Amino acid sequence: MSTLDEVLALLRTIAPSGDETELTADTLLFSSGLLDSLALEELHVAIEERWAPIPPMELARANFDTPAAIAATVARITHEETPVSVVRNLLSDSGRLTADLAPDAMGAGAQLLFDTWHAGGTTLSCGNGGSASTASHFAADLAKLTIVPGQRRMRTLCLNDNASAFSAWTNDEGFPVVYREQAEPWLEPTATLVAFSVHGGSRGGEVSANLPAVARLAKERGAAVVAVTGFDGGALGDLADVHINIPHATEPVATPLIESLHVLVHHALCVAHAP
């Protein structure tokens, strides 16, 4: 029996009686509400009894949110997983997810960018953390790679590039409004907002609340919204006119893997308009 099969069997003993949910490797356990915090504590105890003590660094909930993630955690704490196997699995997942990318969604996103350029509008971008660097990189590439001599250039603006404005709005009004307020003068019906986010922001509004906030303003103004996300897309994916999603949810590799593929997506959006 594989470690994953053992984990699935263990989870079936922890799941509430009467729950007929079919558990798979990527079933969301805690973020979906399928299991609660008491079940998480019970899971920790069961893992330590069955396998080995869990180091503090492994106790982040993200490491236990899917059966596959739990199996990966068990492999690490029992030393079944080596650096080489981690890299090999990361590259394998990267190839599979790249092959599964939806070209139609990326084509639709590229068309919105063309429509914005044709109408003389501005393409705005934003993100948090690593996704902020992707948003900045995207704005630079979209402005430079698409230059055609004699033609009007694409107008781009990355909302997380102005550190002074970012800190001023955060300090004075709060983090949730930091992009909305900067985008306010630019969001017209001719504009497109491209937002990058690994999780897409929580639907409850607590995590990455600045992204759904600026997306809602864009929708109110008649601007288009392109969301480039991972996991299930979150609140940002729900608001998007075009949603480009990397449906991976197994930490600790999910976040870096999704961020890497987001760079591929942003390059595809830019190359679609390259001369």
Swiss-Prot record:
Pathway stated in the Swiss-Prot or TrEMBL entry: Antibiotic biosynthesis; lincomycin biosynthesis
Keywords: Antibiotic biosynthesis, Phosphopantetheine, Phosphoprotein
Modification sites for O-(pantetheine 4'-phosphoryl)serine: S37
InterPro entries the UniProt entry points to: ACP-like_sf, GmhA/DiaA, PP-bd_ACP, SIS_dom, SIS_dom_sf, SIS_GmhA/DiaA_subfam
SUPFAM superfamilies in UniProt: ACP-like, SIS domain
PROSITE patterns reported for this sequence: CARRIER, SIS
One of the protein's GO biological processes: carbohydrate derivative metabolic process
Molecular functions (GO terms): carbohydrate derivative binding
Domain SIS: 113-275
Domain Carrier: 1-78
Keyword Ion transport: no
Pfam family, one: SIS_2
Protein name: Lincomycin biosynthesis protein LmbN
